[in-house]
Amino acid sequence: MNKYVTGLFLLVASVSFSQTDTTSSGKNKVWKNLKYDFEVTAKSVGNAFTQPTRWNKNDFITAGGIVAGTSFLYLADNEAQDFFLRQEKEIPDVVQDFGWYFGSPQNFFIASAGIYGFGLITDNPKVRRVGVLVVSSAVASGIMQSVAKTVVGRSRPMNGGHDSFDFFSKEPGYHSFPSGHAVLTFTLAHAVAKQFDSFWVKAGIYAVGSVAPISRLWVNAHWVSDVGLGMALSIVVVDGVDNFMNKQSYYNYKKPKTINWSLRAGYQTIGLVGTF
């Protein structure tokens, strides 16, 4: 009897210590991944600010295109303002509310933290990478737009004309260029959309991501050139951070095997064949 009791005790103790070791190992891995992701984020943000020193011909062409596009929108600011203000009454309240809530910085960071936190807790490197991409891009583009807002000191539509500037102004009414809502929401949209190949999935994500920037035009908080530059800035920064992370091979995860299904027909037979 004592032998059975002793054996049972050892079995229970073994299971208990095994669970403790597993829990401890899991916590250690979470902290290890968290530290690793923080380092990747810091390096990615740093690279975003030094990247212009390594631009090639295509990069300068892209920058020139953004300047030209922003200039075109600048010339159309007043006409665009009139158009969007006329549409404001026709927009459903639920759409306007979504634009405001989705575009607010606190909700953006909740969404970003949710993506990264899910990847961290589930030990999913692909989702963790998306979270790091979003956070790194948001930090870099957020700093850029904050500095630009203060330096340029452009008046919001409700304060003055589109050509009214007060350089280095501390007044919120002169922090219009570029749109911070556009930068944050399109950073998230572009980073997530890059994970999908389907045109329709991408289109849906970009459509949702465009609601918040456009809503800033409905409420007369920004000029169309503010929004256009904000969206362009977010795309460029996300692409730059994504390319940097790929070149450095920060997250090497095995892609799941896919099965290619094909319809095969033969004499008196028909069926689906899966190729691994």
Task: Give the ranges of each region predicted by the language model.
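Membrane-interface helix-loop junction between the first two transmembrane segments
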Residues: 77-87
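Hydrophobic cores of alpha-helical transmembrane segments in multi-pass inner/ER membrane proteins
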Residues: 109-115
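Alpha-helical transmembrane segments
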Residues: 63-67
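N-terminal signal peptide c-region/cleavage motif recognized by signal peptidases
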Residues: 13-15
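Perimembrane loop-to-helix junctions flanking transmembrane segments
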Residues: 85-97
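Alpha-helical transmembrane segments of multi-pass membrane proteins
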Residues: 69-79
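Active-site microenvironments of hydrolase-like enzyme catalytic domains
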Residues: 118
